[in-house]
A protein has these predicted regions:
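A polyanion-binding, active-site-adjacent surface
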Residues: 2-215
Length: 216
């Protein structure tokens, strides 16, 4: 079990053998990378929690800060700055001085999975960390799921039943039985933007709705 009230996974977390093996492999190849479970970014008293699927290889797995160092972070942090959820300058570096405002960023799986695809057993092993995080965020009002994988894991972490009553739909805002709001967005990956599944305008619309919900 995860220690109470909330602790991030240790840097040598042993829960998922496949992810541990991949981590050790990358530690040998890239000794200057973080190559460890990526801890959440932002304050626990935030009203907004953004949940991604897992760290990116050359992003958070390299830098140690969620969505920092790859294209997904470029789009996410520029959007957070635009809508007042961040202050400072994003330079794709965890030492850039950027800080979040009333916002926190986490991942459903804290370690980098091969091919960016966590296995069901890995979601299950890591879920207690997200559950404990949610439990101590007493001011939380809105969650943003970046992708269907994150959406599904949020519902599981909150034990929302039936999950099928809350389907993943881009820019849909769900009111959950817990009273929390869940906003869905396609993941801000380069693949999704290159293929046209997600545009900058579409992503901004999600956070415009989030801001409106928090100010209501």
């Amino acid at each position: 079990m995860v220690a109470s009230p909330f602790e991030e996974p240790p840097l040598d977390c042993p829960r998922c053998p496949r992810l541990v093996g991949f981590r050790h492999e990358l530690q040998g190849l890239h000794a200057d990378w973080k190559n460890a479970p990526v801890r959440s970014f932002g304050r626990l008293d935030a009203r907004l929690l953004i949940v991604g699927l897992a760290p990116g290889m050359r992003g958070a797995n390299r830098t140690g800060r969620p969505f920092t160092g790859d294209y997904a972070g470029d789009l996410l942090y520029s959007t957070l700055l635009k809508f007042g959820f961040a202050q400072g300058t994003y330079r794709a570096d965890p030492n850039d001085g950027l800080h979040l405002v009333d916002c926190r960023i986490a991942n459903a799986v804290r370690c980098l999975p091969p091919e960016n695809k966590p296995l069901p057993v890995e979601f299950t092993a890591c879920r207690p960390f997200l559950q404990a995080e949610l439990a101590v965020m007493s001011n939380l009002r809105v969650l943003v799921a970046l992708g269907k994988g994150a959406h599904d894991q949020i519902l599981r972490a909150l034990t929302v039943r039936p999950a099928g009553a809350y389907p993943f739909v881009h820019n849909r805002l769900h009111k959950l039985p817990t009273g929390l709001l869940l906003a869905d967005s396609y993941h801000c990956s380069r693949y999704n933007t290159n293929t046209g599944r997600l545009t900058t305008e579409m992503f901004h619309q999600v956070f415009e709705g989030v801001r409106r919900s928090l100010e209501a």
